[in-house]
Amino acid sequence: LISDIAIMLANGITVPAYTTYTEKDYKYLIEDCQPSVIIVSNDEMHNKLKNIINERSFIKKVITFEKIKKVDYKNKYLDFDSITKNDLQESDKIKNLNLKRNSPACIIYTSGTGGDPKGVILSHGGILNNLEGACEIMKPLIDKRPIFLTWLPLSHSYEHTVQFAQI
């Protein structure tokens, strides 16, 4: 959730991926969307991606939540602790992004059960529309302090609605 919102506030487009993807699936997805930054949760996920990262010049930074022991691309690598210890420079502060409702917010890929995964672009307005409808439907179910429990990954479009509904 934090990464998703931070990327959107930086005027970026998020591309959540299933943790169950194989290296081949990740290679396809990365080639298709050509991200400049990849955020990885742990060493296990990093191991699935490290060969792909080394081969792609369009990947400028790799950010990990856990410190990775062996990294072949030190000039691209940042761990979350090193990012949070730095003071924000003026250029890092949030600016007016002039986003439109039809501006892309994220690309969600299908699970690829019928072939290669297909990327679907969700706009900021589309997410807002889903959120407004979901909040209206959920009104009778929500008390003063709702608790949400979901098993959906962020790479599922409904999870985007649920994560923002909590805010």
Role assignments for model-derived ranges:
Residues 9-82:
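Structural core segment of the AMP-binding/adenylate-forming
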Residues 3, 106, 162:
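Conserved sugar-transfer catalytic core signal across GT-A, GT-B, and GT-C glycosyltransferases
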Residues 4-12, 32, 156, 167:
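Short hydrophobic alpha-helices that are characteristic scaffold elements of the AMP-binding
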Residues 105-131:
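Conserved AMP-binding A3 loop
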Residues 7, 38, 104, 110-113, ...:
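Conserved S/T- and glycine-rich ATP-binding loop of Class I adenylate-forming
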